Regions:
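OB-fold and OB-like single-stranded nucleic-acid-recognition modules
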Residues: 1-244
Length: 244
């Protein structure tokens, strides 16, 4: 009965005190081990950025096909480097920018917006009221250059969230958001297992209809298609019947 503890007694019996201390220490160590395992199991945040609230001014040539893109003059042009930096354009929220740039293809425009970027891909979330089309009309943009057929495995994401608005901007947890963004006109992006990024277009080189890609978003898929290049942007021309 020496180790029987009564709550109002000032001190716990020695034997019981040692036992309780050991149990508490073991529980504490287990809790720290579980916390460390959960921390190590988390995916690291991607090095992507959305300059929310930092509005900048831009001027360049507008290219609307297949996705609205601003071509900004690049200093130090050489034979091995493209003449322009290419910035994808999107509207605020889960909306593409197609309706913002009707009848302005090939024109030089001024606009304001916030940068979104990841790796070598850059996007601008445009302030609709800031768009100003200038009088000068530039020559037609460079044609697509075929890089041949490729077979790739990866995931379809919405480019806006993936490039920086959300982190992470891919995976099952982001599926519903990505589906709504793509349905709203945000350019769909195919990200391979090695991190390559290709804008998706249909067999005719045009954007897919709103919900055409919904069931494939955030799923691990493989596809074969023609890889195209225009400037420093790459496009993957695919047939949905060949996705698996």
């Amino acid at each position: 009965m020496n180790d029987f503890y009564v709550g109002y007694v000032p001190k716990m019996p020695p034997g019981l005190r040692v036992f309780v201390r050991r149990v508490v220490a073991i529980i504490g160590l287990l809790a720290m081990a579980v916390a460390a395992a959960l921390l190590l199991g988390q995916m690291p945040f991607a090095k992507s950025t959305f300059e929310f609230g930092q509005v900048r001014s831009f001027e360049g040539i507008l290219e609307t096909n297949p996705y609205p893109t601003l071509l900004v003059d690049r200093p130090g042009e050489t034979e091995s480097n493209p003449k322009y930096s290419r910035y994808l354009l999107v509207a605020p929220g889960k909306h593409g920018a197609d309706t913002l740039f009707q009848n302005t293809n090939g024109k030089r425009v001024r606009l304001k917006g916030e940068l979104i970027y990841r790796a070598d891909q850059t996007m601008i979330e445009v302030e609709p009221a800031s768009i100003r089309a200038l009088e000068s009309v530039e020559p037609n943009p460079a044609p697509f250059r075929s890089l041949g057929e490729v077979h790739v495995t990866g995931e379809i994401v919405d480019s806006k969230c993936y490039l920086g608005v959300m982190n992470p901007g891919m995976g099952k947890a982001h599926r519903d958001c990505a589906s709504r963004c793509i349905s709203g006109g945000i350019p769909p992006l195919f990200v391979t297992r090695t991190g390559d990024q290709f804008l998706l277009v249909d067999p005719d080189g045009r954007p897919f209809p709103g919900d055409a890609l919904r069931k494939f978003v955030a799923e691990p898929i493989s596809v074969q298609g023609e890889l195209l290049e225009r400037g420093d942007s790459k496009f993957l021309k695919i047939d949905l019947a060949q996705l698996y």
